[in-house]
Amino acid sequence: MKIYFLIYDKVEELDLVGSWELIGLLAEKGLCEKPKLISLNSMTPSGEHGMRFSADYHFTDPVQPDVLFVPGGSGARIAMEDIDVINYLKKTAENCHSVLSICTGMYLMQKAGLFKHKKVTTHWAFLEHLKKDNTVTVVE
């Protein structure tokens, strides 16, 4: 199973690294391939607090994950205005087993329409944003 993480400038490091740790443990047990990073901008984006990452792929590369994690960070609110990024998420989600957001990664998924008619939640500070979307059921 291919499990990839979307990264971008100003990604929240904890959202990315915490989940990466769990998937890495699964990979060590042979339950999935080693996780990979797909960048939305440069191949070496910086996180919210300055941590640098080295991407395995750019979102324009022809790769298809089985599972895609979309971590949060202030950069998500910038990336959600890029139509190419939104189209990438829509197209990739069609062939994914699962697409998961962490915290404000939900901005990207919501903009791509991936939450329609689903139950969703996020960090309490961002619930009001989700509640404005009448196509989703917000779980607190």
Tell what function each PLM region has.
Residues W124:
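Class I SAM-dependent methyltransferase SAM-binding "motif I" and its flanking Rossmann-like core
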Residues K132-N134:
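Short loop-to-alpha-helix "cap/lid" segments that border enzyme active sites
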